[in-house]
């Protein structure tokens, strides 16, 4: 199962952990996924989706 936001399509990012002696080791920066229930007027029921917190903030801003 891919850690991906269903609304924005965001995925994990590759990066490096850099030590004091500048030795770089790879790491994965995961997105902050949350399970959220959203009311669908079209289907007249709650839909459970996994979305990132940036998408949740946008939904609150749009008052959805």
UniProtKB/Swiss-Prot annotation:
Pfam families linked: Ribosomal_L28
Disulfides per UniProt: none
GO cellular component, one term: ribosome
GO biological process terms held by the UniProt record: translation
UniProt keyword annotations, A-Z: Chloroplast, Plastid, Ribonucleoprotein, Ribosomal protein
Signal peptide segment: none
Domain of life from the UniProt record: Eukaryota
Keyword Magnesium: no
Locations listed in the record: Plastid, Chloroplast
InterPro entries: Bacterial_rp_bL28 (IPR050096), Ribosomal_bL28 (IPR026569), Ribosomal_bL28/bL31-like_sf (IPR034704), Ribosomal_bL28_bact-type (IPR001383), Ribosomal_bL28_sf (IPR037147)
Presence of the UniProt keyword Ribosomal protein in the record: yes
Main location as per UniProt: plastid
NCBIfam families xrefs: L28
PANTHER family noted in UniProt: 50S RIBOSOMAL PROTEIN L28, LARGE RIBOSOMAL SUBUNIT PROTEIN BL28A
Protein name: Large ribosomal subunit protein bL28c
Lineage, broadest ranks: Eukaryota, Rhodophyta, Florideophyceae, Rhodymeniophycidae, Gracilariales
Gene: rpl28
